[in-house]
Amino acid sequence: MNEIDFSPITTFIFDFDGVMTDGTVFCDFEGHPLRATNVKDGYALQLASKLGYHVAVISGAVCPSTIVRMNSLGVTDVFTGIPDKVLKLNEYMQENGLKPEEIIFMGDDIPDLHVMQCVGLPACPADAVPEVKAISKFVSECPGGKGAVRDVIERVLKVQDKWMTAEAYAW
């Protein structure tokens, strides 16, 4: 894989299931879905948000706990139940004055393909499906739900000299 230029990135957008989770969905005794997320991913998400990056989730799934978890990390741009991720991306770009080259979108499966082709830096976890890996400019060494989100955020912040700043020491 060629050297990746993370310097223009101002925006991180993620799918949720399979990126921030390992893709496993548990159900409680009433049938409500439960998903596990990674604390190290959470640390990186809250730091990026605190440092002023745009951080968003665009997910096809409807899961109220996704919104609660992301909001607890300072991520307020959480869009769930989105059937057309490209349309939502275009709306988000227009509302925030963003250009494709500023954006990383990390996805893991077929529903993410089209939206990933609309950003400057398509990315995926190590365990993404082959079709997603084929179009990704960055493939994390970490699988979904096991540090892939942290990996990509950390790489961007390091390139932009924002990784070990004073803000990094407080959560």
Where do the language-model regions lie?
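Mg2+-dependent phosphoryl-transfer enzymes with acidic/Ser/Thr/Gly-rich catalytic loops
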Residues: 34, 71-72, 77-78, 86-171
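N-terminal charge/polar-biased segments
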Residues: 1-2, 162
